[in-house]
């Protein structure tokens, strides 16, 4: 936190930054760290935002973030299907809790941006429809939806091109998996498919 404080002081003083976004998907892993960062940010009269995980902070910690000037968070939910979140994404994030915490965060006058991806290996059309329903039933301020991309060096790329994963021996790319490498094009084709249902 001391380094971050001097860094932000430099950004706001020398470079006249008037807002900060912490693009760190481990920003709120642990209440103590998040609360210390909130203490640091309360020393600056600027709005700030952070990428967070929905289930790693207590409700009191979200309140401390809001009180210190946090105006919004980005939550990577990935899917509205519990099976996809648990078995495919391997995130083990309770979607009912996500809905509860999104509502809580919004009650603190913070925005919540939810991110979702479609077209994962093993994900069914029904899973994608569940995701659309989950988004509709949750109080996100904004959302981001994208198609899964096979980025070289990732486990997904290895799964598709080597047809196995040594670290996840049960992983398979089933015959329904769309092998489109461009996430944007994949998303467009999935949207058309979902609109027909």
Specify the residue positions occupied by each region the protein language model found.
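Acidic, low-complexity intrinsically disordered segments
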Residues: 1-9, 14-16
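A structural motif corresponding to the C-terminal lobe/cap of the Radical SAM core domain
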Residues: 6, 26, 30-31, 36-197
